[in-house]
Amino acid sequence: MSAGFVHVTVLLQEAVEALAIRPDGVYVDCTFGRGGHSRLVLSRLGPAGRLVAFDKDPQAIAVATELDDPRLTIVHEGFAGLDRELDRLGIDKVDGVLMDLGVSSPQIDDASRGFSFRFDAPLDMRMDTTRGETAADWLARADEAEIRTVIRDYGEERFAASIARAIVANRLEGQFLTTTGELAALCARCVRTREKGQDPATRTFQAIRIFINRELDELQAVLPQAVRRLRPGGRLVVIAFHSLEDRIVKLFLRDASSPPELPRGLPVRAADLPEPPLRLVGKPVREGDEQLARNPRARSAIMRVAERSAVAWDAAP
């Protein structure tokens, strides 16, 4: 990890306040990370309270284990398995679910993890280093069309075709990408127009990381599970860091907080319709200037909050 950088939890107070913690409540932190949110939640729980923390990253699990708090249950899995793991733990409903999405600062700043183009390190990018395919392995076998699609769709990179073509051309010459430095250099050659303040490798690294870790697939899988698990009055709090994540969250919350659409002219009053499963709470929240001065990486963070309706829907989306 780079020296001198201190991990600062994004929207720490805001996220935990949004959960409206009950001392005897049951809460889920879907992304423990280095435990900033979880520690604050635990500080507000009483002896009967409970927190279940998920994380794929073995390093995060090690940090969580050090807390040694009987109210904390640690799950070394991705949050897409929320239903399965809560069933295993004998938990039905919960009072709040928190998701702090994306890659964490410690992961970015640890050169050995292969998330950053700032270091020359093995091209890994797995959040869970105990399983799955590395970025280097995938780039060594994927065809040009698949690489192009991933970089275009998950990185919104205009030069996705050029980058994919160059990767495959290098392979045909026996030159396989094995380090972050090699991939960053290739991107620099292919991205002809650079965005101000952005490295030419930024979008490609984001795209491959999202794909390797199935980040958007897992997000789409967990949102409806979270709604079903919330008891009436329970809160869902989601912090997103880029437009692809936030678009999924925004559309899901919009649909889950809207009444069902009915054919025009149907003789049904609004009062007769079932209550939507969610109610939006406040407006989207961003970090303030003071916090951004301490943690510039939080500039893209946006938090959305919703509350489970009093009338439960079996058909929560």
Swiss-Prot record:
E.C. number(s) listed in UniProt: 2.1.1.199
Enzyme class: transferase
Name this polypeptide is given: Ribosomal RNA small subunit methyltransferase H
Catalysed reaction, written as an equation: cytidine(1402) in 16S rRNA + S-adenosyl-L-methionine = N(4)-methylcytidine(1402) in 16S rRNA + S-adenosyl-L-homocysteine + H(+)
Gene: rsmH
Keywords: Cytoplasm, Methyltransferase, rRNA processing, S-adenosyl-L-methionine, Transferase
Domain of life the protein comes from: Bacteria
NCBIfam families per record: 16S rRNA (cytosine(1402)-N(4))-methyltransferase RsmH
General function of this protein: Specifically methylates the N4 position of cytidine in position 1402 (C1402) of 16S rRNA.
Gene Ontology biological process terms in this record: rRNA base methylation
Keyword rRNA processing on entry: yes
GO molecular function, one term: rRNA (cytosine-N4-)-methyltransferase activity
Localization, UniProt: Cytoplasm
InterPro entries assigned: RsmH, SAM-dep_MeTrfase_MraW_recog, SAM-dependent_MTases_sf
Family to which the UniProt record says this protein belongs: Belongs to the methyltransferase superfamily. RsmH family.
GO CC annotation terms, alphabetical: cytoplasm
Originating species: Laribacter hongkongensis (strain HLHK9)
